[in-house]
């Protein structure tokens, strides 16, 4: 069985979300990668060294420079003639490409798998992660997104895959890249941070969020997250959101400060290794998943904790 894996990259290096997908793909059989972009020889060379990789397909074309899914999907469909499955990270990019590929192939997409139980059988979360569904597909071609927190990252060294240039499908003419606004931060990106400090609506306003949450995060070298309630209230931008409709994270340590623990939020962080919750409501659902719980006034507890570090 040959599996094609979408490689996320920044033009020079392979991004971390790709690595767990390679681990998942290896459970199905032979692992091939697709690197698409403009001037991506360095990315392809790095990808070929990843443990478990058998082959790297390279599509070097200006049409793929900005990863417009309208251009990328036909490329992947063309490559699927020689592959049995297509796997992509369950990221914003992966979730944009995979459904288009599935539609063009006229097959079912299986989203955010947690395990590979067989060549056609997988598990995935449902009901906001409160239940795990086992899904079996009879489709000849499989299109799957992978939840990165469910699989170990493939080692970046140890592989010796071959590199092969593929024919570009070119510009589909359906979309045009205009511009991109990239938020820059010195803090770790949420999906790769080892420690995350998240705040909820109990912080009351944006000023409190910044003065309470950010100093603690800076002391710990942590990423900063937020509940949907905090985002909806305008405390922080949408890219801070952790949860079912935000980012799925699994850091070594997760601080949930002033977060009650709605099902949608728990779905995005419950796989964290250690969860520390601070909330004045001792009956808050967050304490049901917390390893360490502090019941009290966050406006007193968090500054004291920050000072002690």
Set out the residue ranges of the language-model regions.
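N-terminal glycine-rich FAD/FM-binding segment characteristic of electron-transfer flavoproteins
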Residues: 1-309
């Amino acid at each position: 069985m040959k599996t094609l894996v979408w490689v996320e990259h920044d033009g020079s290096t392979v991004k971390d979300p790709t690595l767990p997908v390679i681990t998942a793909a290896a459970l199905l059989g032979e692992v091939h990668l697709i690197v698409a972009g403009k001037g991506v020889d360095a990315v392809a060379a790095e990808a070929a060294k990843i443990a478990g990789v058998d082959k790297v397909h390279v599509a070097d074309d200006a049409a793929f420079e900005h990863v417009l899914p309208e251009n990328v999907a036909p490329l992947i469909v063309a490559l699927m003639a020689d592959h049995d499955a297509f796997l992509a990270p369950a990221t914003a990019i992966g979730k944009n490409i995979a459904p288009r590929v599935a539609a063009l192939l006229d097959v079912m997409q299986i989203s955010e798998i947690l395990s590979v139980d067989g060549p056609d059988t997988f598990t995935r979360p449902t009901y906001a992660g409160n239940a795990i569904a086992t899904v079996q597909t009879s489709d000849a071609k499989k299109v799957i997104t992978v939840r990165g927190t469910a699989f170990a990252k493939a080692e970046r060294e140890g592989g010796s895959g071959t590199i092969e240039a593929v024919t570009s499908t070119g510009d589909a003419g359906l979309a045009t890249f205009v511009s991109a606004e990239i938020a820059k931060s010195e803090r770790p990106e949420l999906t790769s941070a080892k420690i995350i400090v998240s705040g909820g609506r109990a912080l009351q306003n944006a000023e409190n969020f910044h003065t309470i949450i950010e100093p603690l995060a800076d002391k710990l070298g942590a990423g900063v997250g937020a509940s949907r309630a905090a985002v909806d209230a305008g405390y922080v931008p949408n890219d801070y959101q952790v949860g079912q409709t935000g980012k799925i994270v699994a850091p070594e340590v997760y601080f949930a400060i002033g977060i009650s623990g709605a099902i949608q939020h728990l779905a995005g962080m419950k796989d964290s290794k250690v969860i520390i919750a601070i909330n004045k409501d001792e009956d808050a659902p967050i304490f049901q998943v917390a390893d360490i719980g502090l019941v009290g006034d966050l406006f007193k507890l968090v500054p004291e904790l920050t000072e002690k570090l």
